[in-house]
Amino acid sequence: MFEVCYLFGDVFISDDNNACALIVYPDKKKTSLKSILLDLKLITQCVGFKNIKKTLSREALIQKIQPKETMTYLWFIGVYLAEQNKGIGSLLLQEIIQQSIQNNRPIYLETSTIKNLPWYSKFGFKVYSEQDLSYRLYFLKRGL
């Protein structure tokens, strides 16, 4: 994931190294031998061969629902458990929002973690779609 974002997006790491956000700019992601190899690496190291079908179905659904516009795609944001609720993730998200405003890009993301919805809402994100995939998947957008 890191390498994909390094090539086709941005990697944000908090000053204390306790939080990280991975960003992809879909309009910059081009299919190449390197991108295919990175996808294969993601499958073998993160997803696993047993979960390929489920993962590909989920990704196809996301592609179908996501608007085809220039965007900042927040692929992942996380804070070490012991460091949560200290504002580290909020600072990181504010930095991403500021950069997205400067680059004139809305931010899109998905989450299945219901307790995170109020947190995203606090930063101006709105749910624009919900899907049932044996769990609830929420699609969020923060406009400019």
PLM-predicted stretches and their roles:
Residues 10-12, 72, 136-140:
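Short beta-strand micro-motifs in enzyme catalytic cores
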Residues 7-24, 80:
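Conserved beta-hairpin
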Residues 20-77, 84:
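Conserved acyl-donor/pantetheine-binding loop and adjacent beta-alpha core of acyl/acetyltransferases
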Residues 75-84, 108-118, 133, 141-143:
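Conserved beta-strand-loop-alpha-helix junction that forms the acyl-donor binding cleft
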Residues 70-72, 99-112:
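Conserved GNAT acetyl-CoA-binding A-motif
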Residues 4-6, 100, 120:
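A generic structural signal for well-ordered alpha-helical segments
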Residues 90, 102-104, 113-130, 134:
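Conserved active-site alpha-helix within GNAT-family acetyltransferase domains
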Residues 79, 85-98:
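Conserved acetyl-CoA-binding loop-helix of GNAT-fold acetyltransferases
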